[in-house]
Amino acid sequence: MSIDALKERIPDFAKDVRLNLSSMASDETLAPQTKYGLFVAAAVATRNPDVIAAMQAVARDNVAPAVIAAAKSAAAIMAMNNVYYRFVHLASNKDYATMPARLRMNVIANPGVDKADFELWSLAVSAINGCGMCIDSHEKVLLAAGVSTAAIQTAVRFAAIIQSVAVSIEAGAADLAMAAE
């Protein structure tokens, strides 16, 4: 599935989402590897098969398979870390923050791609998953690596757009299912 095919699936009630998707696809603020890896990581975080297929298709046309694999790794490891660290952050009992996580996360240290790209993808997925502690941690690493606040904001904006595409398509599918009854 292509991004154009995905746009066609976005219902009219979400016209702004469709326009944002078009703008995102043509945006050249981020380097290609950064951008297309972000598309894949954020798509995987939405858990929507159509969004994942479209973003992987556009990524395959623009980056190496290793980039796509690393982006999927970012989404997978953040699925775990975002749950765990959101709990640690939100729990009233602060003893959890002093306990070892005992979670394997070697991919963060050795992602197989540029470390800043992996951190940016991880931050975007953390924004989708709502882990403030993870967002702060990844932002700190990115800023120390010299990544601009504008690039960080762009990554989160793209993640927000990709999430809204998934929600819009799912809401439109629910409308179609109700109409068929």
Curated annotation (Swiss-Prot):
Record SUPFAM superfamilies: AhpD-like
Keyword Disulfide bond attributed: yes
Enzyme Commission number: 1.11.1.28
Claim: Electron transport is one of the keywords in the record: no
Active-site residues per Swiss-Prot or TrEMBL entry: 131 (proton donor), 134 (cysteine sulfenic acid (-soh) intermediate)
Origin: domain of life: Bacteria
InterPro entries, per database record: AhpD, AhpD-like, AhpD_core, CMD-like
Keywords assigned by UniProt, alphabetized: Antioxidant, Disulfide bond, Oxidoreductase, Peroxidase, Redox-active center
PANTHER family linked to this entry: ALKYL HYDROPEROXIDE REDUCTASE AHPD (PTHR33930:SF7)
Cited NCBIfam families: ahpD, ahpD_dom
Entry protein name: Alkyl hydroperoxide reductase AhpD
Gene: ahpD
